[in-house]
Design a protein with these regions (language model features):
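Glycine-enriched, solvent-exposed interface loops adjoining structured elements
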Residues: 1-184
Length: 184
């Protein structure tokens, strides 16, 4: 999904869309803050439904690598394979030579006022992108005192977040051998 598509979803939801306007809305307050709000909501959701990534690094025994040296968008290490290691704080200590496969979670690409709506695509999964418009709508309308729509959208967003499955897959097990009936 592009940023343009997300904005249209949100603005249709809150009934503020104007397809003829280059800003997509006639409300200057919404136009001024929608990118910031979308960015804030995507960062919030990415801490729940994390975005997986992988880097491979050639390492030597005794190397100590800071998380920030692996990837600038690194949020959290998942697992490191290929070379014996320990993770202490924000540093990976390696106890051998070889190729380290570093599986981690990353922050999403950031949205600014200069982000091109039709060129930006989200890193987030489809289930997350279906929840986001409610969080954005709730934040955009939270200061609208004439109606409680902001609270309605915020409540719906919170309900949907609680049902969000943070997993990308479930584990599986494979049994092999002559007599596996004792395991069944």
């Amino acid at each position: 999904m592009t940023l343009l598509e997300m904005k249209k979803k949100v603005l249709r939801l809150i009934e503020e869309i104007n397809d003829k306007s280059s800003l997509l809305t006639d409300d200057p307050d919404i136009a001024n803050k929608i990118n910031d709000v979308i960015n804030q909501i995507q960062n919030e959701i990415a801490r729940i439904k994390k975005i997986p990534a992988k880097e491979e690094l050639e390492v030597a025994k005794g190397d100590e690598i800071d998380f920030s040296d692996i990837a600038k968008d690194l949020f959290q290490i998942n697992i490191v394979r290929g070379v014996e290691n320990d993770i202490i704080g924000n540093t990976i200590n390696f106890y051998g030579d070889g190729t380290a496969k570093i599986y981690y979670y990353k922050y999403p690409k950031q949205i600014t006022a200069d982000t091109k709506d039709s060129e930006f695509t989200f890193d987030l999964s489809t289930d997350v992108l279906e929840i986001m418009p409610y969080g954005v709508a709730g934040d955009l309308l939270k200061s609208d005192i004439s109606a409680s729509y902001g609270q309605v959208y915020s409540n719906r967003y919170e309900q949907m977040l609680q049902r969000l499955d943070p997993r990308f897959h479930t584990g599986s097990i494979y049994l092999e051998g002559d007599d596996t009936s004792e395991f069944l």
